[in-house]
Amino acid sequence: GGGGDRSLGVEYKPVLRPGEAVSVLVAWGDVVLAATGTLTAVSTDGRFLAFAHPFTNRGAVAFPLARSWIHQVVPSLDTPFKIGTPTSIVGIVTQDRPQAIGGFIGRFAPVMDISLNFRDVDSGTETFKRFKTASDPFMMTKVIPEMITGLVDNVWGRVGEGSAKLTLKIEGGRLAEG
């Protein structure tokens, strides 16, 4: 089960307008993690500002930007937020500052493809899961392990204690041997 193509499409010549919903993508596919907000401004050369607040506040970054569909706005005097679904990749977030996120529409961030094959030795079932993620050093060390753990819990489908044997194989170009 799983592993169906839930990847987002890419709009190579998108037209976005201030007020539209956009998301910063961390992961998409069988795992979705994104921050959704409002597009504030777009210049004629494709530069944009959005959110009017930071995402991670880490300065120079490279996250995909997606167009989003808003399901619900949760009002709050302290921290209002939107519940949305990314629908297509439209650009790259290159700056994550205290005042806003910014970047370019029609340019795209590098991403990693993560594929996981789970085999339950008790039942003999196999499950394939796949997602893409921003190629970001922080996300690689902090967020991706949590996503994989969540998939293990989800696929395992059991409640309570237990044991699992995990084998991890990392493949990719220009990886150091060792």
Placement of each model-derived feature along the sequence:
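Terminal presequence/propeptide segments associated with secretion/organelle targeting
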Residues: 1-178
